[in-house]
Amino acid sequence: MATDNTRCKAAIIGSGNIGTDLMIKIMRSGKHLEIAAMVGIDPASDGLARAARLGVATTHEGVEGLARLPVFDEIDFVFDATSAGAHVKNDAFLRALKPGIRMIDLTPAAIGPYCVPVVNLDAHLDAPNVNMVTCGGQATIPMVAAVSRVAKVHYAEIVASISSKSAGPGTRANIDEFTETTSKALEAVGGAGKGKAIIVLNPAEPPLMMRDTVYLLSEAADRALIEASVSEMAAAVQAYVPGYRLKQSVQFDDIPAAAPLHIPGLGRFSGLKTSIFVEVEGAAHYLPAYAGNLDIMTSAALATAERMAASLVNA
């Protein structure tokens, strides 16, 4: 790890699957960040043991323990990979001690603005707290935004299917928050008039890769322009999530005014229906390749923090 002044020091709260994978990613590819501390609440955590073996300062006493570590004074960034409820407390505790600390929130708490790197990171480079939405949000919001920049999207519905094995206790405890946060971000970041999110935990063996289906109802538009926009956006996501890909060609259906669809809460709809199918394969840095849902979260969080850190280092 670098010891010069060209990198910002980061701590990770949450020593589970996401936190450990994020630590490995920062160690392998961090340009403007270095990992300085790993924080957990279970002294027997595999993530804490792994961090200690790699020379990272650790504590099993939560954010209170982090504040007592000698390295805390040097930490500029904190990634929170705990739970929505815990993040609210963690942010308040740490911000009281270090008002300028940057929080990258990987829970559905959404204290700060939603951040999807390829869509709106530039607008939030100075934000003290950014929320990475959810795995389903990171995979599908870029596709909604890709269509939104071509045609007005009235309704977006996404179905995120992930392997049961990749869903740890944190994911399972936040199912309601997942659907609520993702739905809101489909509107706020993706540009949809109304958003709906569904998550499916697939128990199949061997475990399946993350699959996401995006259904969009928009005004009539040039299909070629939509296809080009979607392909361009997918390539932009691949820059930081190499395993992200369109599973098949974009599909279109015309909804004539004479035979409109009825969307609960929206009423009758006619125009263009666009269906986009995405697959996310994990990089297998720490997690298995089928856990693309976790990989896209850690990759998006790292891409966000790296851009923020670069702006601080180069200031």
UniProtKB/Swiss-Prot annotation:
* GO BP annotation list: catabolic process
Name of this chain's protein:
Acetaldehyde dehydrogenase 1
Q: Which organism is it from?
A: Burkholderia vietnamiensis (strain G4 / LMG 22486) (Burkholderia cepacia (strain R1808))
Pfam families per the record?
Answer: AcetDehyd-dimer, Semialdhyde_dh
> What EC number(s) does the entry state?
1.2.1.10
Active-site feature positions = 135 (acyl-thioester intermediate)
- Positions with a binding annotation for NAD(+): 15-18, 166-174, 293
**Catalytic reactions of this protein:** acetaldehyde + NAD(+) + CoA = acetyl-CoA + NADH + H(+)
Keywords assigned by UniProt? Aromatic hydrocarbons catabolism, NAD, Oxidoreductase
Question: Which CDD domains does UniProt cross-reference here?
Answer: ALDH_C
Q: Which InterPro entries match?
A: Acetaldehyde_dehydrogenase, Acetylaldehyde_DH_C, NAD(P)-bd_dom_sf, Semialdehyde_DH_NAD-bd
User: The organism sits in which domain of life?
Assistant: Bacteria
Task: Tell me yes or no: is Magnesium among this UniProt entry's keywords.
Answer: no
Against Gene3D superfamilies, the record matches this protein to: Dihydrodipicolinate Reductase, domain 2, NAD(P)-binding Rossmann-like Domain
Q: What are the recorded GO MF terms, alphabetically?
A: acetaldehyde dehydrogenase (acetylating) activity; NAD binding
Q: Which family does it belong to?
A: Belongs to the acetaldehyde dehydrogenase family.
